[in-house]
Amino acid sequence: MKNTSTLLFAAFLSTFVPSLAAMPVADKAMFRAHLGFLADDLLEGRETGSRGYDISALYVASQFQKYGVQPKGDKGTYLQQVPLRKGYLQLDSPTMSLQGKNGDQPLVYMDEFLMGPSLLEDRSTKTAPLVFVGYGIQAERFAHDDYADIDVKGKIVVTLSGKPSRFPTEEGAHFSSGAHKREMADKYGAVGMISLQTPLSEKTSPFIKGREYRFMPSMDWINAKGEPANAVASLQNTASLSLTAAQKLFTEVDVSLDEIYALAEANKPLPRMDLKLSASMAKKSTISPLLSSNVVGFIEGSDPKLKNEVVVFSAHLDHLGMVKEKTGDNIFNGAMDNATGVATLIEMARMFNELPVRPKRSLLFIALTGEEKGLLGADYFARNPTVPLPSIVANVNLDMPILTYDFSSVVAFGAEHSSLKDVTAEAAKKAGLQLIPDPIPEQGLFTRSDHYMFVKQGVPSIYLWTGNTSFNQAEDATKIRAEFLQTHYHQVSDDLKLPINYDAAARFVQMNFQLALEIANAEKRPVWNEGDFFGDTFKK
């Protein structure tokens, strides 16, 4: 008996024009070879700026060259250099204490609070009063202002993680991001920030998980002024608190944190208040410069006019590297995250090289650095593109497609904000797949991968992922995906020993190849939907 997914894949191939014989087909053996190289222990986890990352970047560049993809990096090469600064936290240095009417109360690093390094100061210290500002969000579109009628100048703001539940999922992901909250705190003169875990955030991102990153550096790219592009000078003293420690901030006021949690759960307005406590924070950081590179390849379109419009396909090449302090397996290979995405780009490059007629619009393939450090390579490219920014009409981002099951659907985060939804649905249909809504909206994935840096430059963008359904009725796709996210995501076990389904991998490549054709050959360029929040917020 033939497998159902095999029959659907064959039906998908028959939809191609002009003929099946002339149309490239994804090769699972080629995909497997690329994945095997990129996720090998010899690359030591491909951390941004590392030897392993540089080797992987040269590998991608060599594959682009092999398949006739033109270089579009710096000075006629495939590499766009990204100047960086990295900082390590000196692990014996973080201290934090609360001061109130009962004197000084120290908190315990890693048990009660976590800090990251500074990229601006070797030594960072701050003592200031604490003020609670709800979620720390200002969103005029949703009639929400946590900074109304409260003075935070010269104070440390205390915020709940997350957002009001009434906010739409993807708009809410924008407002709940650390970048937005830091921007608001800086705007109103705060000198520090403390983020509090909530019962919801503890389920989706447990406080204890943060400990695992203590050996890893923070990074930012360096702008023309020689400064970290995204650092907020006034907020070098920030911390996150555990659920238990967070309770201690409300001992001097009439409202308990549990009552605030209850208000948040009921979607009611949160109080804003002086907490009648001060906090002292201190740390030391070791700071140094670093270089890494995006790998950029270009396929010129065939239409005399439309070739001046560019469709970007991106996938981050970096992962978490290795932790020398860890015994046993200490390499974060990042097989799913995101060697799969980059292997997809390379295999797409091969397929486009075999295409008899190039698509009408041009294509840009980018293997990005620094995603795990804060979407840095994408941010740098989007603000320093190697093609004119107005020429970029769309971005499709590939990040950690979970390929351990026989997926029968895809998710396109952000598709409902632009005309890309219909294009993606059509490509999925031709691939014998279903386009489904976000199955895990609580994760706020729309702002957590590289496509969002293109969104912030006004480019309609989506993040394409495998869905939570399977052609194999014996598989529980939802369970398989959840198990990967809970057990293997950002763990050393995300490696080649996973039960990777290479037929599914070929299907994912073919889906993206079809999507690239649909966008590049469409009569009209993608546009934001009328009145869309992201289109209106970031229009150029």
What are these regions (language model features)?
Residues 174-180, 201, 321, 327-419:
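Acidic/histidine-rich catalytic neighborhood of metal-dependent amide-processing enzymes
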Residues 101-102, 112-145, 149, 228-334, ...:
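Soluble metallo-hydrolase cores and metallopeptidase-like ectodomains found primarily
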Residues 44-164, 292:
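Noncatalytic luminal/extracellular "stalk/propeptide" segments of secretory-pathway proteins
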Residues 20-73, 245, 308-310, 529:
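N-terminal hydrophobic or amphipathic helices/low-complexity stretches enriched
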